[in-house]
Amino acid sequence: MSENLRFRVVEEAFKKKAVEVAAPKERPSEYFAKYVFTRQKMYKYLPADVYERLIDVIDHGTRLDRSIADAVAEGMKQWAMEMGVTHYTHWFQPLTEGTAEKHDAFVEHDGKGGMVEKFSGKLLVQQEPDASSFPNGGIRNTFEARGYSAWDPTSPVFIIDDTLCIPTIFIAYTGEALDYKAPLLRALHAVDKAATSVCQLFYPEVKKVTCNLGWEQEYFLVDEGLYSARPDLMLTGRTLMGHESAKNQQMDDHYFGTIPDRVQAFMKDLEIQALELGIPCKTRHNEVAPNQFELAPIYEECNLAVDHNMLLMSLMKKVARKHGFRVLLHEKPFDGINGSGKHNNWSLLADNGTLLHAPGKTPEENLRFVTFIVETLMAVYRHNGLLKASIMSATNAHRLGGNEAPPAIISSFLGKQLSELLDHIEKADKDELFNLKGKQGMELDIPQIPELIIDNTDRNRTSPFAFTGNRFEFRAIGSEANSASAMISLNAAVAEALNNFRQRVDRLCEKGEDKMSAIIDVLRDDIKTCKPIRFDGNGYSEEWVEEASRRGLDTESSCPVVFERYLDSQSIAMFESTKVMNRKELEARNEVKWETYVKKVQIEARVLGDLSMNHIIPVSTHYQSQLIRNVQSMKAIFEPVKADRLSARNLKLIEEIAERTERIEALVEDLTSARRIANRIDDIHSRAISYHDTVEPKMESIRHEIDSLEMIVEDGLWTLPKYRELLFIR
C-alpha cells in the first residue's frame, strides 16, 4: 500500500510549535472595541443632533427616522475608511445556524470617468438579498425571491478585515422573519413590556427591563493535519467511527489543567481579536474531555450577546487555522467522552438597577424576587416541550441524555432554600413576611485561607434549567447552536407568563383586594401549578424519566418528533399573543428544521457508507491477506499438528475479519436502501422521522463493526487517525 497519510500527519503534528502572538502595546481596556462603531465614535463622527436621535433609537426603541440615515451612513463611512475599509455588508443570521454576508465596495462611478466612495442611508438601512436561496420553509420560491435585510441599530456596526459589517434582520418581501434576529428582537420587546408591567407593581418608576445573556462556549481543538486525514470530521463535524482511547477523561486530569502551549497561543490570539471586536472575553480553561476547552465573556444585553457569540464562532474557525488547528463546534465529535454545550445564563435587569431574579433586603423586594422566579417557572412548565424543541438538533441529540449533559427532559433546579421558601409560601399564612437568609460564611479552619461566602443555592449539573443565585442557567443548548433559538422561546414564554400574572392580579385588585394580598394569592396558585417542573434530584437516573412522565413533562427524545412542539396549539397561541411569530413563520421554521435534520443525517450516512467501502473494508482485507499468507507459511514450515496450533489465532482473526466485513457490506446496503425509501417520502416531517427511525440505527450498527475491526487490524495499516492521536496531540 502507498505511504500511510495517518502516520505522516501524526509526525508533522508532533513537530508543530506554538505560533508566536504579539500582544498589542495597549492594555485590553484601551484596544477593546477598536473595530466597533461605539458611542464614542458615533459622537465623534456624527452631527450632534443626529447622534442624539440615534442614541434615542438605541436606548428607547423609537423608530429610526430615514431623514438621519444619510448622516449616519456618512459618519460610518468616514470612520471605516480611516480604518482601511473598502467594502460593506449586511451581516445577518439566516436559518442555517451560521451568518451570511455579501460584500459591496464603496466605490461608484463619479460621472467623470473616475471613481468615488459613496455610502448612502438607503444602503445602510436596507438591502435585498435573494430570500429563496436561504432556508425559508416555502415562504419564498425562486420565482418570488425578494427578501429584505434591515439594519438593527441596537447592535453596533463592526469591521472585519476590510469590510464594514452592519448587523441586520432578514425578512421576506411579505414580512415574515427568515432569520433568528427578527423574532429575537420581538421576543425581547415582549419580555421588556411584560416584565416592566409586573415590575411596576413593586417599583412604579421602572420604565424598561433588559434581558441579559452570558454564554459559555465549549469547543474541541484538533490538529489540522489529523483533521484533514479524517473525512468524517471534515464533512460532518464528528467522528462517525473510532474506538475509544485507552485513556480519555477518566483520570479527571484535563479539567482546569495546564493549557498546552499551542492552545494557549490560539486562545491569546483569539481573545485579542475578540476584544478588538468588542466581545468582552473573561474566562478560558481546559474542559473535562481531552482537547476540549471553554471560553466565556462577561454577560451582555441578549441581542448583542447572541451577535457576539455568532461572530466569535466564526472568528474561532479563522484563528484556529492560523495556529494549525481546526475547531470542532459539533456537540458530540467523539464517542465515549463529553460533548460540548453552550450554557446560557439568562437574567432580567430593571432600569433602576434591580436584578429581578435576585433576592432583596425587604419583604416587598423578596416578594418581587419570588414573583419573577415563580412566573419564570410557570413559563418553563407550560412550554417545557417547546423549550426542548428550541435547543434540539440532529447534532445536539447525540449529547443530550448522556451522563455528561442535561437530560432531554426540561426541569428546573432551585436549590434547597428556595424550594423550601416556595413550599412555605404555598402553605403558610400569607401575612407572614418573606425573609431570605443572606449569604452565610464558611470557616474552613485553615489559617491561610480567608472565610468563604457560600451562595445559598447549590449546583446541580444534571439540571437543564437551574437557578444560580440571581439568574437561570439554561444548560441544554448545543455548542454550535445559535443561542437566539432558545432565547426566542424562553423570553416569549416568560412574557406570556408575566402578562397572565399581571392580568390576574389586576382582576383581584379591581374586586377590592389589596395589591400585595392579590400578588400572594396569584403566586400561591402558580406555585402549585408549576410544581411538576421543579426537580432537585439526579436528572440522569431512569427513575427520573418515569417520574417526569407521571408529572406530565415532555419526555420525547426523537428529534423530528420534538420539533412538533413548535406547532402545538399552546405554542402557537403563546407566540401569536406576544407578537413574536405567527403560525406561518412557525410552520416555515419547522419545515426548515426537519429539512436540516434530514440533510445532516443523510450526509453522515453517505460519508459512513463511503468510508466503510473505500477505507475500512480494503484495509481490513489487506490485513486479512497478510494473515492468510502467514498461515500458509506456517503450514509449509511446520508439521500439520504444530502448524494448526501455531496458526489457530490467525485463523480466528481471518474468520472474524471476513464475518465483520461481510456484515459491514450488508449493513451499508441496508443503509442505502433505508435512505432511498426515506427519500421517496414527500412529506418532510415524515421523511425526517423515517431517517431517525430507520437510517440512524443502521449507522450505529456499522460503527460497532468498524470499531471492532480497528482493534484487530494491524495499527500500521489503519489509515484513519485514531482517537488517541486526535485527542492527545496538541
Language model feature labels by segment:
Residues 2-25, 142-158, 163:
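N-terminal hydrophobic targeting/anchoring segments and the immediately downstream early-domain regions
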Residues 108-142, 252, 375-377, 502-511, ...:
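Short, intrinsically disordered, low-complexity segments enriched in Ser/Thr and Pro
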Residues 525-730:
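C-terminal amphipathic alpha-helical interaction region
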Residues 69, 93-94, 121, 224, ...:
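Short, ordered loop/turn segments at secondary-structure junctions
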Residues 144-329, 338-341, 348-591:
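Glycine-rich, acidic/polar active-site loops that bind/position phosphate-bearing ligands
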Residues 85, 89-91, 308-322, 348, ...:
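Hydrophobic/aromatic-rich, well-ordered segments within soluble, folded domains that form packed cores
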Residues 97-114, 132, 230, 237-239, ...:
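Short linear, low-complexity motifs centered on an aromatic residue
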